[in-house]
Amino acid sequence: MNKSKIRNFSIIAHIDHGKSTLADRILEITQTVSTRELKAQHLDSMDLEQERGITIKLNAVQIKYKDYIFHLIDTPGHVDFTYEVSRSLAASEGALLLVDATQGIEAQTLANAYLALENNLKIIPIINKIDLPSADPERIKGEIEEVIGISAKDTILISAKSGLNVEKVLEEIVDKISYPIDADDDKPLKALVFDSYFDAYRGVILLVRIFEGKIAVNDQFKFISTNKQFHVIELGVRTPTEVKKPFLESGEVGWIAASIRDAKDVSVGDTLTLVKNPTKEALPGYKKVKAVVFTGFYPIDGKDYPVLKESLEKISLSDSSITWELESSKALGFGFRVGFLGMLHMEVLQERLKREFNIDIIATAPSVEYKVYLTNNKVEIVSNPSDLPDRNYIKNIKEPFIRSFILVTEEFIGGIMELCQSKRGVYVNIEYIDKRVKIIYELPLSEIILDFFDKLKSISKGYASFDYEFIEYRDADLVKVDILLNKEKVDAFSFISHRENAYERSKELALKLKDVIPKQSFEIPIQAIIGAKVIARETIKAYRKDVTAKLYGGDVTRRQKLLKKQKEGKKRMKSIGSVEVPQEAFLSVLKSNMDKK
């Protein structure tokens, strides 16, 4: 293969700026997918992606354009999925920077553009949706130069929806993005595993970018970090369906099936090489991603525990950022402590468990990792409130802080600064960019994982965009709040809070639990306590509901239907002592401070 004819590139864009639509137009214009087969968001193969209109998993497709071969590596645009973007960029030589002509540069576009610059990628700026009446391409060009610091002189103005100027984008990819200069088939194999997914018949399928050397069917290869060895059964490229080939060579992006059955054997971001004549060094600059939000996942039916374990293993194959370990709860039995990159990431995984594996789960309140300094000079990392040691043994607790970047129009500055202050934020700076401002605050991570994003969108009428980076751990006055139901402690409802917010959050949670736990044949007190001190209390009055009371006459079948429906509902409850608790009660802990103003 002529290496000078290969172009590997990604698309960088914020949510809703038209990235998946542009990918669809490229597939259509190059006839990679016929117009008849083309559906909107073609590369977004997960149902969830199409419903939410976001890209979650990255996708890689080979495109033939004239006598060139393009490898388009699709990327997500939400802050939670930055790790997917870094993997795409590591496999590319260039990036299309796509900006909405009506919205301008958003915080996540900025973060991903900086990632591309750090990777020394050639960036091609593109302004999309120029056919909209409110489009202002000249202002957006100014933002590209001022905010990102690259020339906007050759910016391409397109409409991905109609296909206007998309052909021009293809020509720019040929002219501006470098071919894989270091590609050399004669060197030892050096390939980056940038993603993986699970196939029921063939095991784990690896997505790889070959940097040097070649790999063929029947070759023995190994992962450099673990030294685990495997045998290539089949390999090929995606167009976007799988096409088998006898070998993959340097510069190419493709897939490898090697009968890998155990999720733990695959390390996304690792370097592959051949067992015979291996490379001496791994590919540089690949950081393992770190989970920042932790929650307990428990099957509603205890019998589903092995199925939940297997499901998490399978999802881990295609999402290496998820961490999970066994944990148990007196209230909920056996489950897992699962780590995520953010709240959207967590919601997506819950949806996938339900859709792909048909498992209903209870999720406990999300938490972050705290550093707990003990009186015996030991340090413990705690992400589960139940694991927090007794107050008498704690010297101090530190919590993670982040630096947040909020891009918004000037009229919303006051409301957003007020929101940041209410979240214990520390003001850093405000930068004015044309008609918009970049507000920089340092915030405790625990304050943004629940409702910060929703409130930000609400205050700014949907116009604010948000990105953040971890900075350090800082001292904090934190307390553990326990919830008692009918005088029994429910460990799944415990949470860690800043002392000044503990009362308000406890009061709100007690009210929510009162709302969602059905009345039963005895009175149920709900109490929030710190140590032995009760800080909030609500009471559920006794009541027994007869679901068939509203029927008259002898309508036996209708009566049986209602009783069956009630029985099904009870299946979805957990007994805590003598109290039946519905799944919604656990979800209300998740959302316990969503509606605070």
UniProtKB/Swiss-Prot annotation:
The keyword Membrane applies. One of its GO terms (biological process) is positive regulation of translation. It is an enzyme of class 3 (hydrolase). Its EC number is 3.6.5.n1. Pfam families: EFG_C, GTP_EFTU, LepA_C. Its main location: membrane. It catalyses: GTP + H2O = GDP + phosphate + H(+). It is a peripheral membrane protein. The keyword Membrane applies. GTP binds at D16, H17, G18, K19, S20, T21, N128, K129, I130, D131. Belongs to the TRAFAC class translation factor GTPase superfamily. Classic translation factor GTPase family. LepA subfamily. NCBIfam families: lepA, small_GTP. Required for accurate and efficient protein synthesis under certain stress conditions. May act as a fidelity factor of the translation reaction, by catalyzing a one-codon backward translocation of tRNAs on improperly translocated ribosomes. Back-translocation proceeds from a post-translocation (POST) complex to a pre-translocation (PRE) complex, thus giving elongation factor G a second chance to translocate the tRNAs correctly. Binds to ribosomes in a GTP-dependent manner. This is Elongation factor 4. It comes from Mycoplasmopsis pulmonis (strain UAB CTIP) (Mycoplasma pulmonis).
